[in-house]
Structures are given as C-alpha cells and as structure tokens.
Amino acid sequence: MITSEVFPLDGVERVENATALSFTDSSLDAIIMTDVLHHIPDVELFFAEANRTLSPGGRLIMIEPWRTGWSSWVYRNLHHEPFDTDVRGWRLPLGGPLSSANGALPWIVFERDRTKFIAANPTLEIVTIEPLMPMSYLASGGVSMRSILPGFAYPAIRFLERYILHERGAMFALIEVRRI
C-alpha cells in the first residue's frame, strides 16, 4: 500500500496530482480514495490517469458525497463546500486543492451523466454504487466536529441506517469502478 496526498503531510509517502500520476502504466491494483473525487479540478483527466495506471482488473474505489433529498439539504445548508447538482460540465472552478470542490460531482458523473461516463471511459466499468451513512457521519461529528452522541448509541444509529433510511437518506456512496 502506498499513501499519497496532494500536499506533503506526516505519515504520507508521496505527493501526487490525480490528473498526472507518477506511477507507470498498469502498475496499480487499486486506487482507494475518500472524499477526493469532488475536489479534482478535471475528473476526465483523472479517469484517463486511473485507466492508464490501473492494471487490468484493477479497482478504483471511492467513498464520496452522494445526492439524496436529505443529503442535498444537509450539504447546501450545513456544509461549507458547494453542492451544485445543476452544473453542466464536470470541471471545477479554479482554486486550491481543498478549496475548489463540488460535493455533487460524484453523483453528477456516476448517476446523472452515467451514459457520458461510460462512453468516455469504455475500459472503466461501474461495478457498484452503494449509498450509505445517512446518520452516522453527522452523529460522529463528521470530519471536523465532536460527536454529538455517545458511543453506545452507534448500534441504534446503524440499525436505523440499514433498515429504514438506507438509500433514501444516504450522505455518501461507495463507488467501485473496475478497469476492464
């Protein structure tokens, strides 16, 4: 496993630009990302790089923000990053590596514009899109806040998520793409 980030950090092995990866052709078995795709300024270049660097059968696995009625309200009213489902293209406005974002971009690419993604990436197959985490992310405090519930409440939250709120209220999706 090789860890990378867009800027130097302690404990991270490499600094990488997702649109110009330094890995050789077909050298990666997987690219695993959490909350990254919606920050990449040109995802079409990134998909070309993923296609180039993944070995046949290699996987691109992402956990990304996802659009549901619930998440749209949360992202638009309680989150600091833009969440614009109506943009026409996939490119982000110019900005810093963390400041430029559209939380709706994964949904736009893999749901709204799925046909475009498939046509533009014939050797990348969408394997799974699994909406998840309608409540646990918020209850945990997300990335930068404290948990609002005690740890013993987690099993009840997970029960509600699995059996009642699963896809309708998801905040994120697990997206798996395979290089053919």
Language model features by range: what are they?
Residues 105-129:
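Short alpha-helix
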Residues 30-36, 62:
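A short beta-strand submotif of the Rossmann-like class I SAM-dependent methyltransferase core
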Residues 132-158:
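C-terminal helical/coil "lid" or tail adjacent to the Rossmann-like core of SAM-dependent
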Residues 44-59:
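A short glycine-rich, Lys/Arg-flanked "PGG" loop and its adjoining helix->strand segment in the class I
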Residues 59-93:
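Conserved class I S-adenosyl-L-methionine
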Residues 123, 164-180:
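Core SAM-dependent methyltransferase catalytic element
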Residues 1-21, 30, 45:
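Class I SAM-dependent methyltransferase SAM/SAH-binding core
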Residues 41-45, 70:
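Short N-terminal helix/helix-N-cap motif within the alpha/beta-hydrolase-1
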